[in-house]
Each structure stands twice: as structure tokens, then as C-alpha cells.
């Protein structure tokens, strides 16, 4: 059996806003994530881990911020792209652990939808 391990990491500045998107869920907040795409750091980290495990670079290679079509891009599309590369190469995910370091907003009531 062939195992591959990927490690994804994402960090962004928080700025004034109304919503933070995490794992596809929009969470009301007085801040937002400053990013070229929608800034979903959970989807970005997971996509980056998949791409890394496949030795396919990172999300910046696949979705450069210099390309205007990626402006405000739904990060679900980034994750779907990485997942498609994984399944097309006949790999599966065995285990995922995501650590979110964020003081606010509190996400407890949103976790089940994430």
C-alpha cells in the first residue's frame, strides 16, 4: 500500500468586515479574512495538504492571485480541484485533522455544518 502525507497551512490578516467563511460556512463576524479568493482558510489548508501529498505544488500555483478570474473565488472550487487531482491519481484520504487558531468568532454552533 502506498501512503502519501500532505501538510497544509494557511494564514491571513483579519480586517473589518461582516463575515468569515470557514469550511464553506459563512459565520457572522465584525471581521473578515483579507484574501484574493473568499479566504476560506480551512478549505485552503486542506487543498494545500492534498496538493502537497500529490507533489502537485500548492494552491498559489493552481490559482495565482495575479489571475483576475481567481478574485473572490469560492474556495470550494479550489478544494474540488485538489480533490479531483487526488481521485484522478487513484488516491484516497485516510485521515484529516484540522487545527483552527482563531480567537473570534466563536465557531462552536457552526462546527456541525462545517
Identify the meaning behind each predicted range.
Residues 5, 16-24, 29, 87-113:
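Active-site microenvironment for binding and transforming phosphate-containing groups
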Residues 50-95, 103-104:
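Glycine- and Gly-Pro-enriched alpha-helical subdomains that act as flexible
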Residues 3-10:
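Short amphipathic
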Amino acid at each position: 500500500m502506498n501512503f502519501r502525507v500532505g501538510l497544509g497551512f494557511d494564514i491571513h490578516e483579519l480586517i473589518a468586515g461582516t463575515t468569515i467563511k470557514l469550511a464553506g460556512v459563512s459565520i457572522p463576524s465584525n471581521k473578515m479574512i483579507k484574501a484574493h479568493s473568499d479566504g476560506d482558510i480551512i478549505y485552503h489548508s486542506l487543498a494545500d495538504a492534498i496538493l502537497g501529498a500529490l507533489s502537485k505544488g500548492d494552491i498559489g500555483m493552481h490559482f495565482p492571485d495575479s489571475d483576475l478570474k481567481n478574485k473572490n473565488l469560492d474556495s470550494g472550487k479550489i478544494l474540488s480541484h485538489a480533490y479531483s487531482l487526488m481521485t484522478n491519481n487513484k488516491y484516497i484520504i485516510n485521515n484529516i485533522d484540522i487545527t483552527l487558531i482563531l480567537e473570534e468568532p466563536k465557531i462552536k454552533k457552526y462546527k456541525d455544518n462545517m
